[in-house]
């Protein structure tokens, strides 16, 4: 897939209202944390590491899919903090909506 198209779909995730809302809520909730904050840097670091593992293991996942997963892997953290919902369950529900809206 062409790089320009890949970045367009990743940009759609970043600008999606649900992603932006959940990310902002998480940033506010973690503003006083010193370590292990779920910042954009964290999301992108995870994506970069996943991409390296993907190449080394010849797993065959697309760069677009890896970056989408990296951006969304902790998107349910705020709901976990506020409601006690396991973040992987909250995240799966939120990610499904975001990914569907972004034509994944």
Cite the ranges covered by each PLM segment.
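Metal-dependent phosphohydrolase cores
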Residues: 1-104
């Amino acid at each position: 897939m062409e790089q320009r198209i890949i970045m367009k779909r990743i940009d759609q995730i970043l600008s999606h209202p649900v992603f932006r809302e959940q990310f902002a809520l998480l940033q506010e909730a973690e503003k006083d944390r010193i370590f292990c904050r779920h910042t954009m840097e964290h999301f992108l670091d995870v994506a970069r590491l996943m991409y390296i593992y993907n190449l080394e293991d010849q797993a065959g996942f697309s760069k677009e899919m890896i970056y989408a997963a990296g951006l969304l892997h902790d998107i349910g953290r705020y709901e976990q903090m506020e409601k006690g919902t396991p973040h992987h369950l909250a995240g799966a529900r939120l990610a499904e909506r975001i990914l569907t809206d972004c034509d994944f």
